[in-house]
Structures are given as structure tokens and as C-alpha cells.
From Swiss-Prot:
Subunit structure: F-type ATPases have 2 components, CF(1) - the catalytic core - and CF(0) - the membrane proton channel. CF(1) has five subunits: alpha(3), beta(3), gamma(1), delta(1), epsilon(1). CF(0) has three main subunits: a(1), b(2) and c(9-12). The alpha and beta chains form an alternating ring which encloses part of the gamma chain. CF(1) is attached to CF(0) by a central stalk formed by the gamma and epsilon chains, while a peripheral stalk is formed by the delta and b chains.
The protein, known as: ATP synthase subunit alpha
Residues of the site described as Required for activity: 362
Reaction(s) the record says it catalyses: ATP + H2O + 4 H(+)(in) = ADP + phosphate + 5 H(+)(out)
Taxonomic placement: Bacteria, Bacillati, Bacillota, Bacilli, Lactobacillales
Organism: Streptococcus agalactiae serotype III (strain NEM316)
Gene Ontology molecular function: any one: proton-transporting ATP synthase activity, rotational mechanism
Length: 501
């Protein structure tokens, strides 16, 4: 059989034309150092800052330092299987976390993977962990109240939707309890809550999750946890993962409350990473951009304009102080970023005043605009009364000869302190807070013994629920006080039929 040269060349040409190249082009590098949650790799000359990188064993990292010779990478997750000489490749993507309704009621790690043993999370939506905060024109002033259910906060340092309110205090002063109570009080308020636990013991996180489940709050809450036993990159990334999940709801017109418990531990984790990446240390060995670490996180909490749907993220960041020192580096940084702070004091906590809020050092810079009219009217002078009581109390240590006016002020002050106490996990609806504060400021408690105040309060609520529910309804719907004569008569009627005459 004769071989036709033309046929052969036509066949070869056809083969060449039909050839489909079947290979992927990826930029890869080689790991030159590994340890303590950090890797260095050569050969990734075009890597982007914050880009997700994949190691040969399937672990992921994030490019942090882009240097002339190599790239500093923080490893997200377990780094025990990574070795020097391993291949690391670019993905061309920045780090994203899963978001959406499917996350609600779940406990996840900072990568959005479930850790509660309840199976996979069915969601395809994702958001980048680092995104720019809304601009000035995309925002709106804070004007809607976020009721925490705690009298001391809602009366003295009110919080509005879209506000950042720092909770600062020593360890074991009830910071977490304040936030958990605020989450419990959002039941039925069409609010989604996110609790970010940073560097907590796993047993502690478990306790908080069980508390939320017990009171039915897990139905509208996402828990993001980076426990103390996890590598520092996960502690560093956890708050950003939490706020990315919150932004998905905010940009869909919903309201979110996010709690960061606590940012001191995130700053320590970031300091560890920065020192391992050989970034120059500054004050207290923190890197120079530790302010930006927190400012870019907290600026993402906002009240959006109506054009963008009017959603909001309200942030409650925590800072743990040492011996009540609120002038420490990280504490002053976060105080200057937030719209106010609630300072919890150890000596108040130990003397049985809980929540242990120091009214003198606590302030809400924008919450006043969000406070309902009824609360404004009953709590207007409360802060001044408390401050003058504390001053007089210190003064009376030296002598007992007091005129009647001073004695009356002291008596009112003691009752104010007692009224602002509240049992754990029992947040109060705002209408009940208004009634008891009205009774306090209008002298109805002046003849009630201090030790009976809490019993008086419970009995008053029960009596109003049974006989004067219309007054509660008026406060709920109009956000203002009912007729003073009507309220006075109702409280007096309760006193007349009770043992607190």
C-alpha cells in the first residue's frame, strides 16, 4: 500500500488543529521556613497582600508580608503537616467566609466551618473577610435604640443601632454577662446576634452556647469561636470573619448585634504574628499598625442610609484591663475608636453591685439620640444624682452631722444604686424599666427600706401586669410616659395594698 505524503501531512495538521492543551498554569513557591503558625516561601513574586495560598497538604495560608526575597504567610489552621521544601501555590483569591441565613444557630470556627457537630452548613454565599467600611454618605446618624434590658445601661449609657460601645474592665467583672444579657434581650426584636469568642477556653464558650440555647437565643445567634488552644492566625482573623457574616445581613436591610469577646486577646495574637514575621515592634512590643487592626474592624459597624436599605451593625467590643488601668495602650486605642465605653469596676462587683457599671467613667457619645422619650424623662438626672451621691458618700465617712437635704440625697442615692442592680440573665423590657425609674425619681421609694427595693420592684411589675397593663402598653407604643397623674395613682394604689406602705 502506497503511503501518500499529502495525506500524512493533512492528518498531522488536523491533529495539531484539534489539539486541546490540558494543563493548569499556577504560580508556585517553595516553603523555606515553617513554625508557630508562620511560613515563609520563595518564588511567589506576584502574590497579593491578603491572598489565599494553598499548601501541598491542602492547608491554607494568607500572604501577609510581601518582601523582596520571600513572602511571609500566616497559616489558617493546623500547620503540623507542612514541611520545609513543600510546594505552596497561589489561588488568586482573597480569603472569604460562608455567610447567610444558614449560619444562624450554628457554632463555627473563623473559617466558617461548623464545630458544633450538627453537620454541614448549606450555603453557597461567601463574603471577603476584609472589605472597606461604608463611606460617610452611605451612613445615617444613629437614632433607633438597642435595648440591652439592663437598667444601668439603658438609663445611663444608652446604645443605638449602628453604634460601637466598648465594654471595658478587669477579668471577672461581668463583661461577658452584660453582652449575653443584651443578646437575650433581642428576642422578638428582629435582630440577628453574632458572638465572637477570641482566645476563650472551650469550656467557657460551651457554657455561653448552652446559656443562649436555654433561653432560646440561639435561634437568632451565630457563635464564632477561636479558642485559646488554636493557632494565633485564627484568633487574629476571627473578628473579621464575624463582621463579614454580619455585613451580609446589614446590606440586606437587617439589624445585627456583634460582640467581640475580647479584642485584647486579638491584639496579643496579632503582636505574636507580627514579631514572628519580623515586623518592627513599637510600644509594648505591639506593631505600628495595631490601631489600624481595630479601627478597620470597628468602622465596619454602621447604620446604613435608607438608599442602602437602612440596615445596621451594632458592635460591643471588649477590652480586658489590668488592675482597672483604662489608660493602657490598647484600651486608649479602642476608647478613641468607639462611640463610648461602659467601664466595669472590680470593687463594685465585689460589693454586690451587679452589673458593676461605674457611672462616672462610662459614657455613650451618640446613644442619647436613640433613647426613647419616656426613658429620657425618667433618667435625665440619674447620672448627676449618682455622681453627687458618690461624692457625698465619701464625704460622710468623716462625720455624721448631716442636714436634712444631705440625708435625703444620701437616701435617694442608696435606693438608686439598689434599683440599678439586676439578676443575671433577667433582662427587663423597657416599659418595666421606665416604671421603676419613675417610681424612684418621683420619691415613691424614699420610704421603702433599701433591703426591700428588689422585692418591691418584682411585686410592682406583677401588680402592673395584673391591673395596669394599659400603662405598659402606652409606653411600648407611644415611647412616651402616660399621664403623670395616672402613673402616680397606679404606683400609689400598689403601695397602699402592699406591705411596702
Amino acid at each position: 500500500m502506497a503511503i501518500n505524503a499529502q495525506e500524512i501531512s493533512a492528518l498531522i495538521k488536523k491533529q495539531i488543529e484539534d489539539f486541546q492543551p490540558n494543563f493548569d498554569v499556577t504560580e508556585t513557591g517553595i516553603v523555606t521556613y515553617i513554625g508557630d503558625g508562620i511560613a515563609r516561601a520563595r518564588g511567589l513574586d506576584n502574590a497579593m497582600s491578603g491572598e489565599l495560598l494553598e499548601f501541598s497538604n491542602g492547608a491554607y495560608g494568607m500572604a501577609q508580608n510581601l518582601e523582596s526575597n520571600d513572602v511571609g504567610i500566616i497559616i489558617l489552621g493546623d500547620f503540623s503537616e507542612i514541611r520545609e521544601g513543600d510546594v505552596v501555590k497561589r489561588t488568586g483569591k482573597i480569603m472569604e467566609v460562608p455567610v447567610g441565613e444558614a449560619m444562624i444557630g450554628r457554632v463555627v470556627n473563623p473559617l466558617g466551618q461548623p464545630v458544633d457537630g450538627l453537620g454541614e452548613i448549606e450555603t453557597t454565599a461567601t463574603r471577603p473577610v476584609e472589605t472597606p467600611a461604608p463611606g460617610v454618605m452611605q451612613r445615617k446618624s444613629v437614632f433607633e435604640p438597642l435595648q440591652t434590658g439592663l437598667k444601668a445601661i439603658d438609663a445611663l449609657v444608652p446604645i443605638g443601632r449602628g453604634q460601637r460601645e466598648l465594654i471595658i474592665g478587669d477579668r471577672q467583672t461581668g463583661k461577658t454577662s452584660v453582652a449575653i444579657d443584651a443578646i437575650l434581650n433581642q428576642k422578638g426584636q428582629d435582630m440577628i446576634c453574632i458572638y465572637v469568642a477570641i482566645g476563650q477556653k472551650e469550656s467557657t464558650v460551651r457554657t455561653q452556647v448552652e446559656t443562649l440555647r436555654k433561653y432560646g437565643a440561639l435561634d437568632y445567634t451565630i457563635v464564632v469561636t477561636a479558642s485559646a488552644s488554636q493557632p494565633s492566625p485564627l484568633l487574629f482573623i476571627a473578628p473579621y470573619a464575624g463582621v463579614a457574616m454580619a455585613e451580609e445581613f446589614m446590606y440586606n436591610g437587617k439589624h445585627v448585634l456583634i460582640v467581640y469577646d475580647d479584642l485584647s486577646k486579638q491584639a496579643v495574637a496579632y503582636r505574636e504574628l507580627s514579631l514572628l514575621l519580623r515586623r518592627p515592634p513599637g510600644r509594648e512590643a505591639y506593631p505600628g499598625d495595631v490601631f489600624y487592626l481595630h479601627s478597620r474592624l470597628l468602622e465596619r459597624s454602621a447604620k446604613l442610609s435608607d438608599a442602602l436599605g437602612g440596615g445596621s451593625i451594632t458592635a460591643l467590643p471588649f477590652i480586658e484591663t489590668q488592675a482597672g488601668d483604662i489608660s493602657a495602650y490598647i484600651a486608649t486605642n479602642v476608647i478613641s475608636i468607639t462611640d463610648g465605653q461602659i467601664f466595669l469596676q472590680e470593687n463594685l462587683f465585689n460589693s454586690g453591685i451587679r452589673p458593676a457599671i461605674d457611672a462616672g467613667s462610662s459614657v455613650s457619645r451618640v446613644g442619647g439620640a436613640a433613647q426613647i422619650k419616656a426613658m429620657k424623662r425618667v433618667a435625665g438626672t440619674l447620672r448627676l444624682d449618682l455622681a453627687s451621691y458618690r461624692e457625698l458618700e465619701a464625704f460622710t465617712q468623716f462625720g455624721s452631722d448631716l442636714d436634712a437635704a444631705t440625708q435625703a440625697k444620701l437616701n435617694r442615692g442608696r435606693r438608686t444604686v439598689e434599683v440599678l442592680k439586676q439578676p443575671l440573665h433577667k433582662p427587663l423590657p423597657v416599659e418595666k424599666q421606665v416604671v421603676i425609674l419613675y417610681a424612684l425619681t418621683h420619691g415613691f421609694l424614699d420610704d421603702v427600706p433599701v433591703n426591700d427595693i428588689l422585692a418591691f420592684e418584682e411585686a410592682l411589675y406583677d401588680y402592673f401586669d395584673a391591673h395596669y397593663d394599659n400603662l405598659f402598653e402606652t409606653i411600648r407604643t407611644t415611647k412616651d410616659l402616660p399621664e403623670e397623674a395616672e402613673l402616680d395613682a397606679a404606683i400609689q394604689a400598689f403601695k397602699d395594698q402592699s406591705q411596702f406602705k
